[in-house]
Amino acid sequence: MKILIKNVDVIYTADSNRSIIKNGYIIIQDNKIKEINDMDNLVYQSNDFDDVISGKGKMALPGLVNAHTHSAMTLLRGFADDMPLHKWLQEKIWPFEKTLIPEDIYWGAKLAILEMIKTGTTTFADMYFEMGQVAKVVEEGGLRAVLSQGLIEANDGEEGLNRALKFCLEWNNRADGRILTMLAPHAPYTCSPDFFRRVVDLSQEYNLGIHTHIAETKEEFQQIREKYDCTPLQYLEKTGALKRPVLAAHCIYITEEDMDLMAQKPIGVAYNPQSNMKLGSGIAPVTRMLSKGIKVGIGTDGTSSNNNLDLIEEARSGSFLQKVNDLDSTALPVDTVLKMLTVNGAKILGFDKLGVLKEGYLADIILIGLNESTFYYPHYNNLSNLFYAGSGNDVTTVIVNGRVIMKDREVLTINEEEVYYKIEEIARRKL
């Protein structure tokens, strides 16, 4: 398949030089970007391509990467709000989740993937249960994902760990390489050191990364300190986890010493600002982490604690939160935010050649309308307008792995009406 995107008003490549191409084109050959340049250098004719997409009045970006979510938790959107994390989990979320059947997970994930496509996310990292159902939806829906079967030691134990490993081996590199897998011990407060060490051993043996929640609340920090005489991050080091690639969600309560350690280890952080605000958890020291060379991406967490999957909105909140926390208006500028949402996210999820619009890179591309919303006028700085005024609903076209999965706001891989019907059917059954 050969696709031409032509006459693009502005292309933000997100490369290391922060290159911008005005009135440009992108040629996609199979699943990779073959050529990217300004229109004056285009030597091909439209009939040389299987599909030609007009980029007039559009901005092109690399597809966005959601570094941490729980996709099927769309089923719990609006179910339990305005509660602290541990009470929220123990009294509302975990009891509800015990009632879910595999088919529920399938439809919850399908609603999430529909929402992600419609708001410009092309890759996401997911931790939940019944992940085989989520993998099926990813395969059908066309997105790229890193999937992990969440493990809580008291519920899962060795049997659950074996199931998680089986899932990882069955689905890793499936769907034309769009699916990767990780092992996922939920958190230090739900998994003992011995359990974490067992996960680390399997991670090493089968070359799998580790996805976990770390230092999300002050309560967790104090609990781990009292029980193990270390910080949650040091807990990972003591169990050997930091010898392996780790995707660490939250990292709010970390010390300077923790960050110095992280800078030397293969750990990436998923910053989830809206969930952290909504649950009253705290503010991750993102600018400090970035200054030390730690790779940080942006996640939404689940929709029950956010309550949407719009990464543009998430990025705006995340930028503003760092500015006010640091009392510094220059904290997390839009160029940094774009890097976090694209190439940083891709790297910490384990994808090479992703997150940059560059020849030879995977063709995950989104187009954003510049003339259909008041938010983009005047056109002084379209990237600034997107992150500080726009939303994911401004995305018009989504391409993943060289395949168009949304065109002119129409999702081509999922029946929207069927998804809405099934979700309402599940909700009625739960009431």
Curated annotation (Swiss-Prot):
Substrate binds at E97, H186, E216, D301. Gene3D superfamilies: Metal-dependent hydrolases, Urease, subunit C, domain 1. Pfam families: Amidohydro_1 (PF01979). It comes from the Bacteria. Its EC number is 3.5.4.28, 3.5.4.31. Keywords: Hydrolase, Metal-binding, Zinc. InterPro entries: Amidohydro-rel (IPR006680), Deaminase_MtaD/DadD (IPR023512), Metal-dep_hydrolase_composite (IPR011059), Metal_Hydrolase (IPR032466), MTA/SAH_deaminase (IPR050287). Coiled coil: none annotated. Its cofactor is Zn(2+). It catalyses: S-adenosyl-L-homocysteine + H2O + H(+) = S-inosyl-L-homocysteine + NH4(+); S-methyl-5'-thioadenosine + H2O + H(+) = S-methyl-5'-thioinosine + NH4(+). SUPFAM superfamilies: Composite domain of metallo-dependent hydrolases, Metallo-dependent hydrolases. CDD domains: ATZ_TRZ_like. One of its GO terms (molecular function) is metal ion binding. Binds 1 zinc ion per subunit. Zn(2+) binds at H68, H70, H213, D301. Catalyzes the deamination of 5-methylthioadenosine and S-adenosyl-L-homocysteine into 5-methylthioinosine and S-inosyl-L-homocysteine, respectively. Is also able to deaminate adenosine. Belongs to the metallo-dependent hydrolases superfamily. MTA/SAH deaminase family. This is 5-methylthioadenosine/S-adenosylhomocysteine deaminase. The gene is mtaD.
